[in-house]
From Swiss-Prot:
Belongs to the glycosyltransferase 2 family. OpgH subfamily. Pathway: Glycan metabolism; osmoregulated periplasmic glucan (OPG) biosynthesis. Involved in the biosynthesis of osmoregulated periplasmic glucans (OPGs). It is a multi-pass membrane protein. The keyword Transmembrane helix applies. GO terms for molecular function: hexosyltransferase activity. It is an enzyme of class 2 (transferase). It comes from the Bacteria. HAMAP family: MdoH_OpgH. GO terms for cellular component: plasma membrane. This is Glucans biosynthesis glucosyltransferase H. One of its GO terms (biological process) is glucan biosynthetic process.
Length: 727
C-alpha cells in the first residue's frame, strides 16, 4: 500500500482524519555546553527587547546578600566573645549557606508583596487577532486516559468558542509502556475525536521507544512536526488551562518577537487528601508572593517549569536541543530536569524567557501523600543535582546559572539543615560533657572562656525566623487586606485558622521531608538511578506496614536525636521538639495526610480552603464531568486478543500506530525485539503467542504493524493435526 493509499485508509477509518498530520521534518541539534554556538546570541528584533533592569536585581539579590552578610556577622559575633572553636567555625559556615538560601526567597517575597498591592493592568492584547499557529502538547506516560483525554476535550471545546480555535492544534503525545493503558488511550482518542472533530484538530501519537523521557517525547514531536507551528504550548498530564489563558499566551508571544518562552504560574487544584489540600492552600496563599517577586526581578531571564508554558518553536528547536552528558546516570546520560536547562539555553541564544505572573487561569495537580511526594522528589532531586554538570556551560546568563543553583539547593539545603542541627547538638553536648580547655598550647596570661553572647543569639534567632516565615506573613497580610480574597477562602477567621493549621502541620512534615531529601541526595551520590515511575494523582493511602517500612529510618533518627538532646537537658529537648515530634509520628502523619477521608473532613469544615476549591472555574467543573463520562466510555477496555480477532478493530488500531519507520534492515536489533520476533515465529496460534508475551513485549507488539499482521495470520487457537484429519 502506498503512502497516499494509507492516508486515504486512515481518513476513512478515523473520524476527523489521520491520527497525526503529515510530517514536516526540522533540525533540532544537541547544543554544545563547552562552547558558545556560532551566531549566538541573536540580535534582538526590538531595541532593548531582551534587556532587564539592573535596579530590580540590585534590590533583590543585593538585598539578600546584604541581609546575609549582616546575619553571618551577627552569628560570628555570637561565637567570637571567647574565641571561635573549630566546631563553631563549622556551624558558622553551615549557617551562612542556609541563611543565604532563605534570604533570597525573603527579598523576592518583599518585591512580590508590593507588586501584589498594586492593581493589575488591563490586558491590552485581549482583542488581538491571532495569525500564528500553536501546537498544544499534552505528554502522557502511563496516566489514566480518562483524565488526560477529558481534559483535552473540555479545553479544546472552550477554545473553539473564543473565535481563536483555528490557530491551535492539539496533540496527545504518549510515552505509555503499559499495553492495557495504551489500548485505553486509543479508545479514549476515538471518543475524543468523535466529540471534537467538528470544531478542533486533535491528534494522538504513541512512541515505540520512550527515549529521553518527556524531553525526548517533545523533541521527537519537534523534529517531525514542529516546523508546522510557530509556537508550542506545553502542558502536563494533570494540566488544565482556561481558554483566555491559552489565547493570552499566544497573543503575548505573537506581540513580542524576542520572546522565546513565557511561563505561567499554575494554581494547584483537585486535591482530595489532606496532604494535597495542604499544598494547595500554601501554594495559593503564599505562592503568588514568591512567584510574583521572582517574575518581577528576573524579568527577561526567567525560568521554565516544564509545563503550562508557551515556547517559540524557532527558539526551542534552534537553541534548546539537549545533549547527553558523559558518563552513566545519575549524573550522566539524558538530562532529567530538562526544563531549567532548556530555559537557560534559550536565553543564551538571545531570546527572552518571561514568567507571566499576572496571567491567571493555569492549573495543575499535586502529589496526594508524603510517599508520592518523595517518589517525585527523588526524580527531581537527581535531575537538579545533575545540573551541577550544566553550571559551567559556556555563555549562560548569570541569572540562568542562579536558577540552576537554586534548583540544586532545593535539595542540598536539607543535608545542610541537618548538618546545622547536628553541629548545634554537638556544641551543646560538648559544653555539657567535655571539660573546657581554658589554656591552649599558645602561651597566654588569661584563660580562653567557651562562652557565647546569648542575647545576640536570641535576637538572631528571631531575625532568622522572620526571614524564614516572611513570605508566609506577606501572603497572610494580602489575604486579610483583600475582603473578596478572604471571603473566597471562607472568611478571615477560617483563613487564620487555616494558616495556623498549615504552619503546624508543615512544621511536623518538614523534618520528614528533610530526611527524605537527605536520603535522596545520598542515594544519588552512591550512583543509584531514580528510574521513571508513573505518578499517583488521587488517592494517597497505603497499608500501615508499608508506611512503617517507608519511614522506619525517619522514626529511628527521631529517637536518636531525642536521646542525644535529653543527654544534655530537657530544655534542649523542648527546643528540638518541633522537629522531633514529626519524626516520632512519621507513620501516622504519613497515613493521615494521605487519606481522602481526612481530606474530605477538613474540606467540610472549611479548613485549608482555596478560591479554586470553593468556586471552581468553569473549565475545572467541566473537566470533572467529562472525566466521569470518559470513564464510562472506556469501562470495557480492548485487549490485544480482540484486536487480532476483529479486522475492523485491527484497522482502527493500525490507524493510530505511530508511522515512524521501523528498524531498517542491517541495523542492530534490540534484545526485546529479537525475543518477540522469535516468539511470534514459533507460535502455533494467537493464544499461545499472547500467553508468552510479558507486558513490555506486548507493548512492543502493539506498536509494530508487521508483528501484528504476522500474529493476525495465525489461527486463533491451535488445532492438532490428528484432530483436523479426524474431522
Amino acid at each position: 500500500m502506498t503512502v497516499s493509499e494509507n492516508s486515504v485508509l486512515e481518513t476513512e477509518v478515523l473520524v476527523g482524519g489521520s491520527a497525526m498530520p503529515n510530517e514536516r521534518p526540522g533540525a533540532m541539534e544537541p547544543q554544545s555546553l563547552s562552547q558558545m554556538p556560532e551566531g549566538f546570541p541573536r540580535r534582538s528584533t526590538v531595541a532593548n527587547g531582551v534587556r532587564s533592569k539592573v535596579s530590580r536585581r540590585f534590590f533583590v539579590v543585593g538585598g539578600a546578600l546584604a541581609l546575609s552578610a549582616f546575619a553571618i556577622y551577627e552569628m560570628g559575633a555570637v561565637f567570637s566573645i571567647g574565641g571561635i572553636t573549630p566546631l563553631e567555625y563549622l556551624m558558622l559556615a553551615l549557617f551562612a549557606i542556609n541563611f543565604c538560601w532563605i534570604a533570597l526567597a525573603f527579598c523576592s517575597g518583599i518585591a512580590g508583596f508590593f507588586m501584589l498591592l498594586k492593581k493589575p493592568k488591563p490586558n491590552e492584547l485581549e482583542q488581538t487577532e491571532l495569525h500564528t499557529r500553536t501546537a498544544i502538547l499534552m505528554p502522557t506516560y502511563n496516566e489514566s486516559p480518562d483524565r488526560v483525554f477529558s481534559a483535552v476535550s473540555v479545553m479544546a471545546e472552550a477554545l473553539s468558542q473564543t473565535g481563536h480555535g483555528h490557530a491551535f492544534d492539539w496533540f496527545i503525545l504518549s510515552d505509555t509502556t503499559d499495553p492495557e493503558i495504551a489500548l485505553l488511550e486509543e479508545q479514549a482518542f476515538l471518543v475524543l475525536r468523535q466529540e471534537t472533530h467538528k470544531h478542533s484538530r486533535v491528534y494522538y501519537r504513541r512512541r515505540r521507544k520512550n527515549v529521553a523521557r518527556k524531553a525526548g517525547n517533545v523533541a521527537d514531536f519537534c523534529r517531525r512536526w514542529g516546523s508546522r507551528y510557530d509556537h508550542l504550548l506545553v502542558l502536563d498530564a494533570d494540566s488544565l488551562m482556561e481558554s483566555s489563558t491559552i489565547t493570552g499566551l499566544a497573543q503575548r508571544m505573537q506581540a513580542d518577537p524576542d520572546a522565546g518562552l513565557i511561563q505561567t504560574i499554575p494554581s494547584l487544584i483537585n486535591g482530595t487528601t489532606l496532604m494535597a489540600r495542604l499544598q494547595q492552600f500554601a501554594a495559593r496563599i503564599y505562592g503568588p508572593v514568591i512567584g510574583t517577586g521572582l517574575g518581577w526581578w528576573v524579568q527577561k531571564e526567567g525560568n521554565f517549569w516544564g509545563h503550562n508554558a508557551i515556547i517559540r518553536t524557532e527558539a526551542f528547536m534552534g537553541a534548546a536541543g539537549l545533549p547527553n552528558l558523559k558518563g552513566k546516570p545519575p549524573f550522566g546520560g539524558h538530562i532529567l530536569s530538562h526544563d531549567f536547562v532548556e530555559a537557560a539555553l534559550i536565553r543564551r541564544a538571545g531570546w527572552s524567557v518571561v514568567i507571566a505572573y499576572d496571567l491567571p487561569g493555569s492549573y495543575e495537580e499535586c502529589p496526594p501523600s508524603i510517599v508520592d511526594l518523595a517518589v517525585r522528589d527523588r526524580r527531581w532531586c537527581q535531575g537538579n543535582l545533575q545540573h551541577s554538570r550544566i553550571l559551567p556551560t559556556k555563555g549562560l546568563h548569570w541569572v540562568s546559572r542562579l536558577h540552576l543553583m537554586t534548583g540544586i539547593m532545593a535539595y542540598l539545603s536539607s543535608p545542610f539543615w541537618l548538618l546545622l542541627i547536628l553541629t548545634g547538638l554537638m556544641l551543646a553536648l560538648q559544653a555539657h560533657f567535655i571539660r573546657p580547655e581554658y589554656f591552649t598550647d599558645q602561651f597566654s596570661l588569661f584563660p580562653t572562656w567557651p562562652i557565647m553572647d546569648s542575647d545576640r543569639a536570641l535576637r538572631l534567632f528571631y531575625i532568622t525566623m522572620g526571614v524564614l516565615f516572611g513570605p508566609k506573613i506577606f501572603g497572610v497580610l494580602l489575604l486579610l487586606k483583600d475582603g473578596n480574597f478572604a471571603r473566597s477562602v471562607g472568611g478571615r477567621i477560617k483563613a487564620i485558622l487555616s494558616v495556623i493549621f498549615e504552619v503546624i502541620l508543615s512544621a511536623l512534615i518538614a523534618p520528614i521531608m528533610m530526611f527524605i531529601h537527605c536520603g535522596a541526595v545520598m542515594s544519588i551520590l552512591m550512583g543509584r538511578d531514580s528510574g521513571w515511575s508513573p505518578q499517583r494523582r488521587d488517592d494517597g493511602s497505603m497499608p500501615w506496614l508499608t508506611l512503617i517500612y517507608r519511614h522506619r529510618w525517619h522514626m529511628l533518627a527521631g529517637v536518636m536525636l531525642g536521646y542525644a538532646a535529653i543527654l544534655d537537658s530537657l530544655t534542649l529537648l523542648a527546643w528540638m521538639s518541633p522537629a522531633l515530634i514529626g519524626l516520632w509520628l512519621a507513620v501516622p502523619i504519613s497515613a493521615w495526610t494521605g487519606s481522602i477521608k481526612i481530606g474530605e473532613f477538613f474540606k467540610r469544615i472549611g479548613i485549608l480552603a482555596t478560591p479554586e476549591e470553593r468556586n471552581p472555574a468553569p473549565i475545572c467543573i467541566r473537566a470533572q464531568e467529562a472525566r466521569a463520562a470518559y470513564q464510562a466510555h472506556i469501562e470495557q477496555p480492548w485487549t490485544l486478543a480482540q484486536v487480532l480477532k476483529d479486522p475492523a478493530l485491527m484497522e482502527l488500531h493500525l490507524a493510530m500506530v505511530d508511522k515512524q519507520p521501523l528498524r531498517a534492515a542491517g541495523t542492530p536489533i534490540e534484545p526485546v525485539e529479537a525475543i518477540v520476533h522469535v516468539k511470534v515465529h514459533e507460535a502455533q496460534c494467537q493464544q499461545s503467542a499472547l500467553a508468552l508475551f510479558n507486558r513490555q513485549e506486548m507493548a512492543l507488539v502493539l506498536a509494530n504493524p508487521l508483528m501484528l499482521r504476522s500474529l493476525q495470520k495465525l489461527p486463533e487457537q491451535f488445532v492438532p493435526e490428528d484432530l483436523v484429519s479426524f474431522c
